[in-house]
């Protein structure tokens, strides 16, 4: 600002002016009092001049002061505009200085608040771009690896399927084996029990656990002689060891109800030997092998009693020569008078 003032002092216009009252009369603005004094002086001189001189003096006395006043006003306006320009430049400088001050204060507060923030922004932007490029490259590599692994897995699966197909073609068909508990073996009606009777005689021997389990899980296990549990059961002499194992596995099914056991016994009556249209009891064929009194329930029918049943505490029990429970007894007609009265 001082430089501008120095320039203004050195490069002043030709017409110098001052707004103060004590300025030089040459630069003083004209006024109406001055014009009136001049008019009086002109009137005094005009008395001695002619008409032409009066007109010329009038133009000089009236127009020239006004023109001078106009020129002084224009010069004053020019100076005022110049000073206004200086004021505007000073305000612009002040604005720049104030903006710089505010920017410095904000930068200082930013550095104080965020001390960990980076200051080199250009390097940070370059590093961010490099990180993005590396991440994209990593994703591409991961995709390629996954595609390669899928291809290898597919090849292995196809190779395994081909090997299985070849093995299935070369392998012969094996008939499925069913367990003995799921297969029922049927015997013909005319089949006779051709096995030799196994007699124990007077020597009492203890059987193994399988025989004991067979005694407790037979068709008539709901009636059991507690005194003869340990002895062998010979009334079912046609039952082999394999059928005993089957009976053990199917014991739960046969224990559902007494009716099921009776139906099974009736259905298996074809295995008994038949002589002269009469069912022969296996207990009669092998009387010495009879152990349990509860191994089978027999129906009481009218007929002669050939043998007596031994006591419960005897070493062995013999079966009466009655018809087997596996067969249906022949009904004999009775007279009405022999029936018992209704109760």
Swiss-Prot record:
Component of the DASH complex that connects microtubules with kinetochores and couples microtubule depolymerisation to chromosome movement; it is involved in retrieving kinetochores to the spindle poles before their re-orientation on the spindle in early mitosis and allows microtubule depolymerization to pull chromosomes apart and resist detachment during anaphase. Residues 1-35, 150-219, 302-343 are annotated as: Disordered. Pfam families: DASH_Dam1. Keywords: Acetylation, Cell cycle, Cell division, Centromere, Chromosome, Chromosome partition, Coiled coil, Cytoplasm, Cytoskeleton, Kinetochore, Microtubule, Mitosis, Nucleus, Phosphoprotein. Residues 125-158 form a coiled coil. Residues 316-336 have a biased composition (Basic and acidic residues). The gene is DAM1. Residues 167-183 have a biased composition (Polar residues). It is found in: Nucleus; Cytoplasm, Cytoskeleton, Spindle; Chromosome, Centromere, Kinetochore. It comes from Saccharomyces cerevisiae (strain ATCC 204508 / S288c). Component of the DASH complex consisting of ASK1, DAD1, DAD2, DAD3, DAD4, DAM1, DUO1, HSK3, SPC19 and SPC34, with a stoichiometry of one copy of each subunit per complex. Multiple DASH complexes oligomerize to form a ring that encircles spindle microtubules and organizes the rod-like NDC80 complexes of the outer kinetochore. DASH complex oligomerization strengthens microtubule attachments. Within the complex, DAM1 and DUO1 may form the microtubule connections. On cytoplasmic microtubules, DASH complexes appear to form patches instead of rings. Residues 207-217 have a biased composition (Acidic residues). GO terms for cellular component: cytoplasm; DASH complex; mitotic spindle; mitotic spindle polar microtubule; mitotic spindle pole body. GO terms for molecular function: identical protein binding; microtubule binding. The modification N-acetylserine is found at residue 2. This is DASH complex subunit DAM1. One of its GO terms (biological process) is mitotic sister chromatid biorientation. Belongs to the DASH complex DAM1 family. The modification Phosphoserine is found at residues 20, 31, 257, 265, 292.
């Amino acid at each position: 600002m001082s430089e501008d003032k120095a320039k203004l002092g050195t490069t002043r216009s030709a017409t110098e002016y001052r707004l103060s009252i004590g300025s030089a009369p040459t630069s003083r603005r004209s006024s109406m009092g001055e014009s009136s004094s001049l008019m009086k002086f002109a009137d005094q001189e005009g008395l001695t001049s002619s008409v032409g001189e009066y007109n010329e003096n009038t133009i000089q006395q009236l127009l020239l002061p006004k023109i001078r006043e106009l020129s002084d006003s224009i010069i004053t306006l020019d100076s005022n505009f110049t000073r206004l320009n200086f004021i505007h430049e000073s305000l612009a400088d002040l604005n720049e200085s104030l903006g710089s001050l505010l920017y410095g204060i904000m930068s200082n507060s930013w550095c104080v608040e965020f001390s960990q923030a980076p200051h080199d922004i250009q390097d940070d932007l370059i590093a961010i771009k490099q990180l993005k490029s590396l991440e994209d490259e990593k994703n591409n590599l991961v995709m390629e690896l996954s595609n390669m692994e899928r291809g290898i897995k597919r090849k292995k699966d196809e190779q395994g399927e081909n090997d299985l197909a070849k093995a299935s073609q070369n392998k012969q068909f094996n008939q499925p084996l069913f367990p003995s508990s799921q297969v029922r073996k049927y015997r013909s009606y005319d089949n006779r029990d051709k096995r030799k009777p196994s007699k124990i005689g007077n020597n009492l021997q203890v059987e193994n656990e399988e025989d004991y389990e067979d005694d407790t899980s037979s068709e008539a296990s709901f009636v059991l002689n507690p005194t003869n549990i340990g002895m062998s059961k010979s009334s079912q002499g046609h039952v082999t060891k394999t059928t005993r194992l089957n009976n053990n596995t199917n014991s739960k099914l046969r224990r559902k109800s007494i009716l099921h056991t009776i139906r099974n016994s009736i259905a298996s009556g074809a295995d008994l030997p038949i002589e002269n249209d009469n069912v022969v009891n296996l207990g009669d064929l092998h009387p010495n092998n009879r152990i349990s009194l509860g191994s089978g329930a027999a129906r009481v029918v009218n007929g002669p009693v050939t043998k007596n049943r031994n006591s419960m505490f005897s070493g062995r029990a013999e079966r009466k020569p009655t018809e087997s429970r596996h067969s249906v007894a022949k009904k004999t007609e009775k007279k009405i008078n022999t029936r018992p009265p209704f109760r």
